[in-house]
């Protein structure tokens, strides 16, 4: 028996969000963080280092590309495609484009495609019969296409509003590639009921891409879940049986091919580690998925009568499966934040289906909390920036000097102009939201998304020099280079993948692993690995010159040694 839908939506509540405004808003969120910054520690710099290594190994054939290594060390994430894309982008980019920016271009595209695929996935889910609002006795209910478009707009705004999306979606790491291909699979399964070719191509791209980006097990689970959903739906849908069979066979074949690809390339790895710190994991869930998690819970509550018949309500079944898989992965794997990133499209989808059932008081609570939180964050960013430029107020300026010793602030007219424009746009948006306008179900997500975009833009403009100084390895490498000169040959011991990549990129150093032979005039050692140095090198050949500290990190020291024997070559 079909349960009555809790969505009661009139046609006037699904008015169109202007396309130009939506596109410009998405660009304002996507571009800051990709333009004008240094590669950051650790994952961002590490991934870029593997891309540089692949670019330098073009002459060694394709076999080197199947097992990327950085000075003989394999990547922590068994991914291939993200490193390939970055290396290809640097290879094809003209010489006047900086290598690190060229490597980011495919990731700009992947973040864009993530937003697009999520929008279309929700659009198709919202057109399914079980998602439709209550039909009014005398007409006037929302038309299916307009209703679906309004919910898709709401889901896109909800996804951008997620606090956990901002940083990880602007790094050149396998995590963003996994997010992109997850959204491809999501759209592919969601759209198969209405179309065949494009969703199947999207699902194929997503399954193969996720497998090659370090997530073959997740891809397999997504494929199995989509297949089960299609099989259950076939029992209730009699129209176009041949189309449904082709859809099921196609998805089954694609899932099997993705699993076979992972086996052929030896990408299957099991890193299941039960969580040791449940409170920390709980805090991660609370802030990382804000503000979609309370709305997702509201959806489950308001649609609770439909949860027992999920096969007839694909708009609930599909995001619930994707969210369950990714949240389970978050709990059972060490990279919890990067695993939880993959849950955001599904949680944003569930949040979107809360919008037609949201009470006026709850919508007002969301607006007021968002207004206060993001306005306070923006005000803090401006105050600290003013303190960096003028020394007033004194306390924020003193805090910056203490946390980032040696940082010299600079003024950029372009950055200031962008930040000022974003702040004025936020003020206008708040004024518009407080005004009397026709109701639209996506309006409750405007301030959360706008506030998240505002603060991210301010951080990536006003605070970018400070963040580059604090999160880049460049100051550390420059300190070492001032003592060794450049270019120089360095032997290394105990350095992390990110540190190795940074010394190669920022310092143009030739790096060699430390051994009993003094092959270079200089040796650098991570302070945490100093206790094992005697097992690797003959310290009689070296004289300690200095301890170099990364300015913004008291726990990251590099020991610099100089060769004293004349036996090296």
Per-segment meaning from a language model:
Residues 164, 177-194, 347-350:
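Specific aromatic-rich, kink-prone transmembrane helix
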Residues 2-19, 23, 172, 191-569:
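Membrane-embedded architecture of ER/inner-membrane glycosylation machinery
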Residues 164-177, 216-218:
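Short acidic/glycine- and proline-prone juxtamembrane loop motifs at membrane-interface regions
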Residues 105-143, 160-161, 184:
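Transmembrane-helix motifs of polytopic, lipid-linked glycan transferases
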Residues 80, 84, 93-116, 120-121, ...:
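Loop-to-helix entry region of an early transmembrane alpha helix in multi-pass inner-membrane enzymes
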Residues 148, 156-161:
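Transmembrane and membrane-interface helices of multi-pass
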Residues 47-77, 81-84, 88:
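Extracytosolic helix-loop segments that constitute the early lumenal/periplasmic catalytic or substrate-binding loops
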Residues 118-121, 165, 185, 296, ...:
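Hydrophobic/aromatic residues in alpha-helical transmembrane segments
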């Amino acid at each position: 028996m079909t349960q009555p839908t809790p969505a009661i939506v009139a046609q006037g509540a699904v008015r169109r969000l202007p396309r130009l405004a939506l596109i410009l808003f998405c660009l304002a969120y996507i571009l800051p963080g990709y333009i004008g910054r240094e590669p950051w520690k650790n994952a961002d710099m590490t991934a870029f280092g593997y891309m540089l290594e692949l670019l330098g190994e073009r002459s060694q054939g394709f076999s080197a590309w199947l097992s990327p290594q950085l000075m003989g060390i394999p990547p922590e994430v068994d991914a291939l495609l993200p490193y390939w894309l970055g290396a290809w982008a640097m290879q094809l980019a003209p010489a006047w484009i900086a290598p690190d920016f060229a490597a980011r271009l495919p990731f700009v595209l992947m973040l864009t495609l993530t937003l697009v695929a999520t929008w279309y996935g929700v659009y198709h889910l919202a057109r399914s019969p079980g998602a439709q609002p209550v039909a009014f006795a005398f007409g006037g209910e929302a038309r299916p296409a307009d209703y679906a478009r309004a919910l898709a707009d709401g889901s896109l705004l909800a996804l951008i509003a997620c606090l956990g999306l901002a940083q990880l979606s602007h790094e050149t790491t396998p995590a963003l590639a996994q997010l992109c291909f997850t959204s491809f699979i999501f759209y592919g399964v969601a759209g198969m009921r209405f179309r065949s070719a494009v969703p199947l191509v999207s699902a194929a791209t997503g399954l193969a891409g996720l497998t090659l980006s370090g997530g073959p097990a997740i891809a397999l689970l997504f494929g199995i879940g989509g297949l089960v959903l299609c099989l259950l739906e076939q029992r209730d849908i009699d129209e176009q049986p041949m189309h449904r069979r082709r859809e099921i066979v196609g998805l089954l074949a694609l899932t099997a091919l993705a699993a076979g690809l992972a086996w052929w390339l030896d990408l299957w790895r099991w890193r299941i580690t039960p969580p040791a710190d449940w409170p920390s994991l709980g805090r991660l869930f609370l802030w990382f998925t804000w503000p979609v998690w309370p709305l997702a819970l509201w959806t489950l509550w308001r649609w609770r009568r439909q949860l027992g018949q999920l096969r007839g309500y694909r708009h609930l079944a599909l995001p619930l499966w994707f969210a369950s898989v990714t949240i389970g992965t978050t709990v059972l794997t060490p990279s919890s934040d990067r695993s939880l990133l993959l849950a955001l499209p599904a949680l944003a989808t569930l949040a979107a289906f809360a919008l037609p059932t949201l009470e006026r008081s709850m919508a007002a609570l969301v607006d007021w909390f968002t207004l206060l939180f993001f306005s306070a964050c923006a005000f803090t960013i401006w105050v600290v920036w003013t303190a960096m430029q003028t020394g007033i107020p004194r306390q924020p300026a003193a805090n910056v000097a203490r946390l980032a010793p040696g940082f010299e602030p600079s003024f950029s007219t372009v950055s200031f102009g962008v930040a000022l424009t974003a702040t004025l746009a936020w003020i206008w948006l708040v004024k518009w939201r407080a005004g009397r306008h026709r109701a639209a179900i996506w309006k409750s997500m405007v301030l959360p998304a706008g506030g998240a975009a505002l603060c991210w833009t301010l951080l990536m403009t006003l605070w970018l020099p400070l963040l580059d100084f604090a999160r880049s390895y460049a100051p550390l490498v420059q300190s070492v280079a001032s003592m060794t000169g450049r270019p120089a040959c360095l032997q290394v011991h105990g350095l992390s993948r990110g540190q190795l990549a940074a010394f190669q990129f920022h310092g143009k150093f030739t790096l060699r692993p430390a051994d009993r032979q003094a092959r270079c005039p200089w040796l650098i050692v991570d302070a945490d690995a100093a206790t094992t140095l005697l097992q690797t090198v003959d310290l009689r050949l070296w004289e300690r010159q200095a301890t170099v500290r990364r300015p913004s990190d008291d726990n990251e020291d590099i020991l610099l040694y100089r060769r004293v024997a004349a036996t090296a070559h």
